[in-house]
């Protein structure tokens, strides 16, 4: 199952909590997360430019991911494609959950958000 930040800023919290509940009920073998990058020529970027979609900042994406992880109760393999958390992927999610939350919390407090945003802006493809 894949988790993506599609609810935007206005629904971020409820999206993270409710998605974690649904994911946990499904008991997936694998949960993956990917950051949301708005590419030129896509409808979602056009919606953001018109003010109809409010994408998250890098810090807000990390905060949403942390909230999702805190609420996820499925013992699965966990893979994240976020820049700061690549070393947190692997099996046995529940035994590593506290470590993942701590790493995300550290990134939220001390991460170089400008560098992360620049990395995302420079992406040309998935």
Which residues make up each language-model segment?
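Canonical radical SAM enzyme core domain
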Residues: 5-18
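Auxiliary Fe-S-binding modules of radical SAM enzymes
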Residues: 17, 21-126
């Amino acid at each position: 199952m894949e988790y993506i930040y599609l609810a935007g800023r206005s629904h971020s919290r409820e999206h993270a909590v409710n998605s974690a509940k649904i994911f946990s009920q499904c008991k997936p073998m694998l949960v993956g997360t990917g950051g949301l990058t708005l590419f030129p020529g896509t409808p979602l970027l056009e919606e953001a430019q018109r003010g109809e979609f409010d994408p998250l900042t890098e810090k807000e994406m990390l905060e949403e991911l942390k909230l999702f992880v805190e609420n996820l109760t499925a013992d699965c393999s966990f893979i994240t494609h976020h820049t700061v958390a690549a070393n947190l992927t692997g099996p046995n999610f529940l035994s590593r959950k506290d470590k993942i939350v701590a790493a995300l919390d550290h990134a939220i407090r001390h991460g170089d958000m400008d560098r992360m945003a620049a990395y995302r802006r420079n992406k040309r493809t998935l």
